[in-house]
Amino acid sequence: MAFFSCFALASILQGPASPDQLRVMVWNVLRGGNSVQQGPEKALQVIRDAKPDVVLLQESYDIEGDRPKLGAWLAGELGWRHFQGESAHLCVLTPYDIDATFFHHEWHGVGAKLKDPLGRSFVAWSIWLDWRSFVGYELRDHPEMTDAELIEAETKRSGRVNQAEALLGHLKTEGHLNESLPVLLGGDFNCPSHLDWTKDTQRVFERRRALDLPVSQLVVDAGFEDTFRKIYPNPVQHPGITWSPMYRGSLAAEEGTPQSFERIDRLYVHKMNDNLASKLVPVSAHVLPVVWESDQIPAEERVFPSDHGAVVIDFKWISTDPMSK
């Protein structure tokens, strides 16, 4: 069993095995790494170990001291490129060429057109939505709430639905919803997916119901596909939890009250249209950290320096040109 576990972990941490693969990481790095001892250095090591081709960062804030924002500092350490623009915290980080950049809102969306070493281009967006009235906490604190009242956590008591609609509207205006290139949309949605709140998960998880949660439904209705659920369609067998590996309860070594564990960090790929010369197909997925650290370790001393897990998705480039087959 120990041998199998080590082998499985080594397989996950291997980077893309061929030029036809693309690895994308989505990660909210907790306040620019400032909340954990040597947080920026630990974040750098996580990225180096994961070997992504693209990192969609959230909370890329100024590093305490005389260093720049986290994304800029990581790019310098890795010898990569990055785009954060006027955003307070959103960043696209990559070794690839950045041919164009896109800006929606300083808090909610930045994007970039990237080109890999073989000349294949795609668009990647880093996004973040309102954290208030987290539906899992609403159900935890008010278990008597009706389904309609819970949905209002998304539609009325937070700005998530309005922000998602504005973001998707901007992508449509930019032409990214009928783009002739693959389009990725990833980040911290601060809400679960309707694909995870089902009758089966309601039976297994203490704080879930079978609900058509609106934010993820909006994204799917706009033509995007949830890459993690494409690989792992069963949310009971593969929950993909990203909130929270750091804060898990109310023990002395932690902060806060018992959590509502959810997959709030996600990566979507837009369903391909007929004009694409090649498309990106998700082929594997995992969430970091693979093993959660002991909850007896104070949060500021953790090796994994964030309260959010990182989503890592491997894609394969598939040619749609019949002449290339």
Where in this protein do the model-derived segments appear?
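Sec-exported extracytoplasmic/periplasmic mature domains
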Residues: 48-52, 75-79, 98, 172-176, ...
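Active-site beta-strand/loop signature of hydrolases that rely on acidic residues for catalysis
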Residues: 22-29, 43-67, 124-126, 153-200, ...
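A solvent-exposed, charged loop/short amphipathic helix patch at secondary-structure junctions
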Residues: 135-158, 200
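N-terminal, active-site-proximal structural segment of metallo-dependent hydrolase catalytic domains
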Residues: 2-7, 12-77, 118-122, 297, ...
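Structured beta-strand-rich core segments of catalytic domains in phosphoester-bond hydrolases
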Residues: 36, 58-141
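Short, solvent-exposed loop/turn segments at secondary-structure junctions
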Residues: 31-32, 62, 97-98, 129-132, ...
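Extracytoplasmic/secreted proteins, especially bacterial periplasmic and envelope-associated proteins
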Residues: 38, 42-46, 69, 73, ...
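Metal-dependent phosphoester-hydrolase catalytic domains
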Residues: 103-106, 113, 173-184, 191-325
